[in-house]
C-alpha cells in the first residue's frame, strides 16, 4: 500500500512540474543551475520565445 501512495505522489509531482514548464521553454533557474552544476559560470535563455538554454 505504501508503494502505491509513493507512486501516486511522484506522478502528481511530475505532472505539476510538467505544467510549470511551458512547452519545453527554457526556465532560467533550471538552466542556470544546470550549467553551474556542469562547471560553467552561468546559464541563460535565448532564441525565439527564449526556448534554448546556453551555458557560458
UniProtKB/Swiss-Prot annotation:
Signal peptide range: 1-24
Induction profile: By septic injury.
Assigned protein family: Belongs to the invertebrate defensin family.
Name of this protein: Defensin-1
Keyword entries, A-Z: Antibiotic, Antimicrobial, Defensin, Disulfide bond, Immunity, Innate immunity, Secreted, Signal
UniProt KW Zinc keyword: no
Top-rank taxon: Eukaryota
Principal location: secreted
GO biological process: defense response to bacterium; innate immune response
Stretches of the chain forming a coiled coil according to its record: none
Organism: Centruroides limpidus
Described purpose of this protein according to its UniProt entry: Antibacterial protein involved in the immune response to septic injury. When combined with 14.026 kDa and 14.059 kDa hemolymph antimicrobial peptides, it has a strong cooperative activity against the Gram-positive bacteria B.subtilis and S.aureus, and against the Gram-negative bacteria E.coli DH5-alpha and K.pneumoniae ATCC 138833. Does not show detectable antibacterial activity when present alone. Has no hemolytic activity in human erythrocytes.
Localization terms from the record: Secreted
Disulphides: 26-45, 31-53, 35-55
Gene Ontology cellular component terms for the protein in this record: extracellular region
Amino acid at each position: 500500500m505504501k508503494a502505491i501512495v509513493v507512486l501516486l505522489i511522484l506522478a502528481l509531482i511530475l505532472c505539476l512540474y510538467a505544467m510549470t514548464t511551458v512547452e519545453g521553454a527554457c526556465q532560467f533557474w533550471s538552466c542556470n543551475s544546470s550549467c553551474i552544476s556542469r562547471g560553467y559560470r552561468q546559464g541563460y535563455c535565448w532564441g525565439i520565445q527564449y526556448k534554448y538554454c546556453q551555458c557560458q
